[in-house]
């Protein structure tokens, strides 16, 4: 086994169990380990402030227990400029962005890596993400692989990473399943062992999303219509809805034509008229797409795809892999055709491509290719 004692790793400590166990495992592997806690949002109410303070206290307690130094850094300005403003602009344009992906790209593997490099003189950074990486020996580019725990795999959120960033990153829990991570934390007496996983928007936490978004973007209520143009309800703002969404339409129990009692789903957003089109039944043709067009492409090996390629794709997190064909348009744009039509393909979200366990990269869904029978 190679000697790690001369290698310094800076672990992104979030105050959660995954980063806690990552730090422990790296220490066991002989690395010089230090922690870095990022503050990426300026809280504006007591509840948020308490949560952030609790996370920092937990991160500090874990570092004290492991005997490692914890640094702190404030990236709130970078987060606002490079993540949050894009997030708002996308919602304003009627799309549904994924801020976690942008946060990884701009903050955790850019601002964090630069600070770890320039100020803390790190050889590697480490995060508590459920992904794996290859360690090639013959000058080949490292690859990013799915996490071993298929239920927790987070490669979808990391597709923007380049092979250079992968080469500088370690993912200690990527080879473990979540119950094992909690077991290790408990065995080592780490305070985060039973702490629940965080959900909600990256760094903004679990506040009420509608209320939160309404603080920054004025909502424009409008009509909910059937595809035939019948008004069947009111929406509070198109930005609060995403394609394929069932909950929150407040038109449940309403029968469609011919006494149809199937549930209603968001089938389309008509931005010009500020109208939400609702359809009945999850198999409605309007919900289906034959493929998609994607741009803002990031390939892990940084080599554009020039030839037609068979692979699989995910158009949202925790989705089953969809067999597909990538047809390059140019270096910045691709067309993707699914083997079978798919529902709820959403502009603004990311399409992430795989060959077996290897994450190839991905792009932003610009538009869906509608089902030809719709």
From Swiss-Prot:
Subcellular location, record wording: Cytoplasm
GO CC entries: cytoplasm
A molecular function (GO) term: tRNA-uridine 2-sulfurtransferase activity
Family according to the record: Belongs to the MnmA/TRMU family.
Matches recorded under NCBIfam families: PRK00143.1, trmU
Its job: Catalyzes the 2-thiolation of uridine at the wobble position (U34) of tRNA, leading to the formation of s(2)U34.
Protein's name according to its UniProt entry: tRNA-specific 2-thiouridylase MnmA
Organism expressing this protein natively: Vibrio parahaemolyticus serotype O3:K6 (strain RIMD 2210633)
Name of the coding gene: mnmA
């Amino acid at each position: 086994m190679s000697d790690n004692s001369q290698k310094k790793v800076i672990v992104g400590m979030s105050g959660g169990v995954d980063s806690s166990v990552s730090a422990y495992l790296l220490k066991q592997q002989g690395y010089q380990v230090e922690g870095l806690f990022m503050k990426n949002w300026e809280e504006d109410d007591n509840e948020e402030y308490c949560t952030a303070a609790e996370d920092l206290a937990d991160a500090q307690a874990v570092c004290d227990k492991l005997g490692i130094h914890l640094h702190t850094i404030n990236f709130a300005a970078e987060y606002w400029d490079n993540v949050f403003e894009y997030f708002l602009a996308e919602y304003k344009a009627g799309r549904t962005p994924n801020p976690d992906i942008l946060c990884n790209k701009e903050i955790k593997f850019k601002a964090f890596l630069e600070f770890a490099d320039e100020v803390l003189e790190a050889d590697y950074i480490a995060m508590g993400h459920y992904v794996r990486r290859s360690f090639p020996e013959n000058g080949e580019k490292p690859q990013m692989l799915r996490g071993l725990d298929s239920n927790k795999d987070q490669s979808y959120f990391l597709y923007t990473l380049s092979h250079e960033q992968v080469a500088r990153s370690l993912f200690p829990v990527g080879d473990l399943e979540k119950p094992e991570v909690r077991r290790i934390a408990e065995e080592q007496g780490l305070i985060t062992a039973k702490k629940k996983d965080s959900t909600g928007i990256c760094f903004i936490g679990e506040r009420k999303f509608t209320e939160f978004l309404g603080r920054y973007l004025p909502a424009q209520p409008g009509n909910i219509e059937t595809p035939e143009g019948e008004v069947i309800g009111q929406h509070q703002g198109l930005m609060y809805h995403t394609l394929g969404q069932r909950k929150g339409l407040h038109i449940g129990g309403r029968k469609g034509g011919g006494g149809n009692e199937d549930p209603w789903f968001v089938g389309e957003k008509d931005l010009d008229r500020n109208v939400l089109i609702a359809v009945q039944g999850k198999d409605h043709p309007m919900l289906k797409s034959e493929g998609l067009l994607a741009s803002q492409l990031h390939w892990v090996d940084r080599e554009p795809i020039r030839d037609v390629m068979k692979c699989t794709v995910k158009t949202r997190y925790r989705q089953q892999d969809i067999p597909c064909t990538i047809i390059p348009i140019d270096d910045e744009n691709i067309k993707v055709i699914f083997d079978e039509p798919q529902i709820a393909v959403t502009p603004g979200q990311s399409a992430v491509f795989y060959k077996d366990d290897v994450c190839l990269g991905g792009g932003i869904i610009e538009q869906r290719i509608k089902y030809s029978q719709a």
